Regions:
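Accessory nucleic acid-recognition modules appended to NTPase machines
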Residues: 41-172
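Amphipathic alpha-helical segments of the small helical/lid subdomains adjacent to P-loop NTPase cores
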Residues: 1-39
Length: 172
């Protein structure tokens, strides 16, 4: 398998070569774009059509939005979720809630973050001063970053305002 070959080359400290490197990078980019959601993967394998894959991923994101509205009728949960790409693009040390939800109390924000985490649509990465001493004793609940649980959905969410995630991204 490719994995066994890469492991063998890595262990022996031999380069993989340009051809294999290009193939692995193409496969990696493909995974980053399609993601791992079974419906999106199946659509890609059956059709090899990125437009159809993008439609599937947009449908999944719409289902997430519907679920968020059931959990939080104010729409704040959806705002926090939709802002993840912009927040990560800022390259800030943490998710800046105040730029998404101004004038909200910290305890209500923490409840919303807990709801997002429980929905299993995002991963929460908390800041810790000393992770060696045990994360639970050192994590700062007010300093965190949010990441989508699926890279393909993240790519589609980044371009949510477009009708279709641009072909140029898929064709690189």
């Amino acid at each position: 398998t490719t994995t066994a070959l890469v492991r063998k080359l890595f262990d022996s400290r031999h380069p993989i070569g340009d051809k294999l490197h290009r193939k692995l990078m193409r496969d990696f980019r493909l995974y980053m774009l399609v993601g791992g959601m079974p419906q999106a993967v199946n659509e890609y394998l059956q059709t090899n059509n990125f437009r159809k894959v993008d439609t599937i991923k947009r449908d999944i994101l719409n289902l997430y939005e519907d679920d968020f509205k059931k959990i939080d009728s104010t729409g704040k949960l959806s705002l926090l979720f939709d802002a993840i790409p912009a927040q990560l693009n800022k390259n800030a040390a943490r998710y800046q809630v105040s730029s998404v939800l101004a004038n909200d109390r910290a305890d209500s924000i923490l409840e919303l973050i807990a709801e997002l985490k429980d929905s299993k649509t995002v991963l929460v990465s908390y800041h810790a001063n000393d992770p060696n001493a045990g994360m639970s004793t050192n994590k700062d609940l007010c300093k965190f970053k949010l990441f989508l649980c699926d890279t393909g959905l993240f790519t589609t969410l980044m371009f949510k305002d477009k009708d279709f995630t641009e072909n140029i991204i898929y064709e690189k």
